[in-house]
Amino acid sequence: MNLLEHMGKAAKQASWQLAMLSTAKKNQALAVIANLLESESQTILQANERDMAAARESGMSEALLDRLLLTPARLAAIANDVRQVCRLNDPVGRVIDGSLLDSGLKLERRRVPLGVIGVIYEARPNVTIDVASLCLKTGNAVILRGGKETHHTNQATVNVIQRALEQCGLPAAAVQAIESPDRQLVNELLRLDRYVDMLIPRGGASLHKLCREQSTIPVITGGIGVCHTFVDENADFEKALLVIENAKIQRPSACNSLETLLVHQAVAKTFLPLLSARMHAFGVTLHASPLAMPYLADGKAKVVAVEAADYDDEWLSLDLNVDIVTDIDAAIDHIREHGTSHSDAILTRSLSHAEYFVRAVDSSAVYVNASTRFTDGGQFGLGAEVAVSTQKLHARGPMGLDALTTYKWIGYGDDLVRS
């Protein structure tokens, strides 16, 4: 039995114990984790500094460096997120529905943990805590495989989690991390279907492709966010600029940040110079289509010609594609062609246009007069999220607690036999 099989077997055994825990016991473990994250913050931050130094030396982009960075404020926020998970309702054991059948069998459908979840992610140290806390709350064990960029941070964080579990009399194997950077171990994890019940990749398109093609475990894909906002012909310009500013500027490296702005041709001449001035204030580079370039070339913001491939990639930086479309249908066609089914928005004062857009755009989250940045487990009231799914089975959008459960049928009889 190799390393991964040992980890898988230990995780499966831990999952049986977790599935039997009361909500109070799970919350106790989460509270201890949150407290230890704070008391051991210097150890975790020092580990993160080692990862940051190595990442800078390797030439990592600013966007990825921002994802990798932990600050005292970010770590404190992560600890508070764990406490928020404590306050969330536990879905495990909840009766979804039930009925008394003509046969006399009392039948109910009850939420239960999935079992063991595998998560593969890249330069996102917060994922370690987010995933672990949600899995523990739902009675699932988890095997984590972070990128080599987060090696020291993940090691320190998982050590804190396992110490907390042991303090609460729970198996440390409930949260395990693959520490070796050997990529062959990823391939082995993808085939560990004897022990792992669901796999969630959080990373770039190549990672998602690898998991879809090689995994023998059910895979939940998503998190790649080529997010769009369409400025309709009757949008309120000043309010639209505030939404665009938030969607692009607040955290450009996030998967729910705005990447492509589509503007109705009827308002392009007036709106685009205003956009240029607003984006200039934040150092945004505009990547303009041939139609948009005449209205942006003399503006304040830096502008370059958009490349065809730009429409299909996440910038994750202070860059924004800008194009002009003839009408709402052209905007929808563009989103269907280049979107990733993550988060897309319309800015409009027309109720009929808003409803048409919502029905036509097949994304996991669609917004009317709101920023795409809202696609987040915390913002949706789900607590920390394990991922944002852009597929339709078994979960869609930010994956909170319910998405980490399945259900079982339970039948109650009085020595009942089938006739």
Swiss-Prot record:
Pathway linked to the protein: Amino-acid biosynthesis; L-proline biosynthesis; L-glutamate 5-semialdehyde from L-glutamate: step 2/2
Main location: cytoplasm
SUPFAM superfamilies in UniProt: ALDH-like
Keywords for the protein's UniProt record, in alphabetical order: Amino-acid biosynthesis, Cytoplasm, NADP, Oxidoreductase, Proline biosynthesis
Localization terms from the record: Cytoplasm
A molecular-function term among this protein's GO annotations: NADP binding
GO biological process, alphabetically ordered: L-proline biosynthetic process
EC number: 1.2.1.41
Catalytic activity: L-glutamate 5-semialdehyde + phosphate + NADP(+) = L-glutamyl 5-phosphate + NADPH + H(+)
CDD domains: ALDH_F18-19_ProA-GPR
Membrane-traversing stretches: none
InterPro entries: Ald_DH/histidinol_DH, Ald_DH_C, Ald_DH_N, Aldehyde_DH_dom, G-glutamylP_reductase_CS, Glu-5-SA_DH, GPR_dom
GO terms for cellular component: cytoplasm
NCBIfam families linked to this entry: PRK00197.1 (NF001221), proA (TIGR00407)
Family, per entry: Belongs to the gamma-glutamyl phosphate reductase family.
Functional summary from the UniProt entry: Catalyzes the NADPH-dependent reduction of L-glutamate 5-phosphate into L-glutamate 5-semialdehyde and phosphate. The product spontaneously undergoes cyclization to form 1-pyrroline-5-carboxylate.
Protein name (record): Gamma-glutamyl phosphate reductase
Organism: Yersinia pseudotuberculosis serotype O:1b (strain IP 31758)
Gene: proA
